[in-house]
Amino acid sequence: MAFLKLTEQNVRGKTVLIRADMNVPFKGGKISDDTRIRASLASVKYCLDNGASVIVMTHLGRPTEGEFHPEDDVAPVAAHLGGLLGKDVKVLNDWRENKPALNAGDVVMLQNVRINKGEKKNDLELGKAYAALCDVFVNDAFGTAHRAQASTEAVAQAAPVACAGVLMAGELDALGKALKQPARPMVAIVAGSKVSTKLTILESLADKVDQLIVGGGIANTFLLAEGKAIGKSLAEHDLVEESKKIMAKMAAKGGSVPLPTDVVVAKAFAADAEAVVKDIADVAEDEMILDIGPKSAAALAELLKAAGTVVWNGPVGVFEFDQFAGGTKALAEAIAQSKAFSIAGGGDTLAAIAKFGVTEQIGYISTGGGAFLEFLEGKELPAVAALEKTRRVNGLI
């Protein structure tokens, strides 16, 4: 991937428009988690430290285009950002009619981009209106990179200079390192409730990795493909043949899809359900598999410790219930102890990493849910493609 980076730009005396992802959750009318705001601080501070004025734009919630309601207002986000920066961050509601006059060191925020008509349809005129505000456009919203919208793609095409922010560049560099030029052996963990939601990821990674670990309902479907009885466990019988093809593809290249030989089962999916460890051959008809067993976890942990690159998407058990968390904990700790370059993404994965206290030991934690998954699938991310295109158009590569 070839794109300009904010940290390569001379922004002194310029106005920089940063598309951030500050779509934070609220509880009781207050921001309950400011992780996404903090994630883009590096880009904002780079601009301020180098003599620029900054305009931040973000989406918040899912408003109806052309309509404004109090819950759509980014004012609380602007106030929180201002608190972190030690500055007053004003919200601009009429920025199309009144272009802001800014001085170096100023920071302002546009009103919620998703109330603008044409935002979701990637309207070029709206993109031009955004671009007219700035000398340099910065996309720092990896979480929305898989969407072609006016504030991510059209603006990049219209801006004098379009580049990746510190967060965006970090995401793309880490993903590129993990998937484009991985240290071997490369191991991927893909887990979740359904093969159908991650089939394209499994197929794409099967071409790249040396070992493909599956977990959750996905593993159950693969166990069915191996002819194993899984009781009343969650599985997709109609995708057994697809699972067989993926296992055959891995075997043909000398790799494998290592499936559990022992599992943790229960008769009900509940926080107080009794957990029983069994060999896979002993799973009864009235039992469901809710985690991998200790022998399987130990074997997979050895694979991870010996890996050169690890890509992790999804917990291998119902880790929210402590009695079914052992497998995911063992793998998390193995990744933390491994010398491999590791990258992890997806909401449940991040929750597991936090629960087991290994955040600092993971090489890179992706902030993008859908964008992370689509990158794993090998899909083009529209917002990233726009940055690459503008670099080519400007004759820079």
UniProtKB/Swiss-Prot annotation:
Top EC class, one word: transferase
Residues at which substrate binds: D21, M22, N23, R36, H59, L60, G61, R62, R114, R147
Domain of life the protein comes from: Bacteria
Record carries keyword ATP-binding: yes
A GO term for molecular function: ADP binding
Signal peptide (from-to): none
Reactions mediated catalytically: (2R)-3-phosphoglycerate + ATP = (2R)-3-phospho-glyceroyl phosphate + ADP
Record-listed E.C. numbers: 2.7.2.3
Residues noted as binding ATP in the record, renumbered to the chain: K198, E320, G346, G347, D348, T349
A GO CC term attached to the entry: cytosol
The protein's assembly and partners: Monomer.
Protein name stated in the entry: Phosphoglycerate kinase
Lineage: Bacteria, Pseudomonadati, Pseudomonadota, Betaproteobacteria, Neisseriales
